[in-house]
Amino acid sequence: MLDAVAIACDHGGFALKEALKVALPDVQWLDLGTNSADSVDYPDFAGKLADAIKAGKAARGILICGSGIGISIAANRHAHIRCALAHDVTGARLCRQHNDANVLAMGGRMIGEAVAKECVEVFLNTKFDGGRHQKRVDKLGSC
């Protein structure tokens, strides 16, 4: 696994974020908040995670909001982020193998803790296949 993994959420993802930190104690988490179930704005926390990756504090990140949709959209507004929304292990694996995703988004109201844990483990331990997928990922930089 990686040295540090950034994790951030809004209020809809707070419970799952905390559960993942307990379920995966061997991960060196860089917790960027939020730190309660009080209502906050997901773009703020997607931005904090994107900034941490850009600064080299973490190579990959996990983002969680209620559905995973809003926070993934916000993350992908940052040019150096390739955020994929996944609610199953297949999506978590393929976003690494084919798309070299550096951020995994999930919905705290959409996915159970056990599946989320599996998704994070697969995401962190799957390598990018490169090859024919590399030219496609390279084209993302010109969008």
Give the location of each predicted region.
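Short, high-confidence coil segments that cap the C-terminus of an alpha-helix
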Residues: 2, 57-59, 100
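N-terminal beta1-alpha1 ligand-phosphate binding loop
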Residues: 2-20
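C-terminal binding/interaction regions
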Residues: 6-8, 12, 89-143
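A short, Lys/Arg-enriched amphipathic alpha-helix followed by its capping loop at the start of a domain
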Residues: 19-27
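A short beta-strand-loop structural module common to alpha/beta enzyme folds
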Residues: 28-39
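Charged helix-capping and loop-helix junction motifs
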Residues: 44-47, 86-88
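Short, structured active-site "lid" loops
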Residues: 45-63, 67
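Mid-chain, well-packed structural core segment of small domains
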Residues: 63-109
